[in-house]
Amino acid sequence: SHQCCEDFALMRSIPGMVVICPADGVEAEAAVKAAYKYQGPVYLRMGRLAVPVFHEDGFKFKIGKGEIMREGTDIAIIANGLMTYEAIKAGEALEAIGIHARIVNMSTIKPLDEELVLKCAKECGKIITCEEHSIIGGLGEAVCSYLAETYPVPVKRIGVNDKFGCSGTAAEVLKAYGLSAEHIVEVTKVFLNR
């Protein structure tokens, strides 16, 4: 099936458009309810891969607000969609080797939770973004654009590197693009040593 890797970029460029990519089924349901109540256009991307649910039933989704899933101060890993689960797994693996990564679920790409991004930059000093999207125009670029003008810190983007989407099982596609917890761990170790 078709793999769209540029939808966030296209939707972010439309004035007034809200762009959301929930991390699990509970958040997806809450995001649909929030989108229904929102007075304006909303683009809501749903992934095809089932991921474990880590939000509690009754979770209240707030457009434009991210959430810290795991505390840490060595580095912040900001993710959305199914990559949030991969980032959480990476955070656990990094903790086991003494790296304390803050994991952030940033389901709203536009408007970006600039307050939380700034907090991560100030408290962690380095940021990695993770998304199932092109590194051009998505979450990583939104974070970089904001920080370049407010509080420049090193940022590494993990995503699809300027390629068209490919077909295969979800696991095959994620592996082909390096969108896995294992890859996040390796990138984090290298990035922290720069």
Where do the model's predicted regions map?
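Conserved thiamine diphosphate
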Residues: 1-37, 192
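Glycine- and acidic-residue-enriched helix-capping/beta->alpha junction motif
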Residues: 35-41, 143
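Thiamine diphosphate
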Residues: 45-194
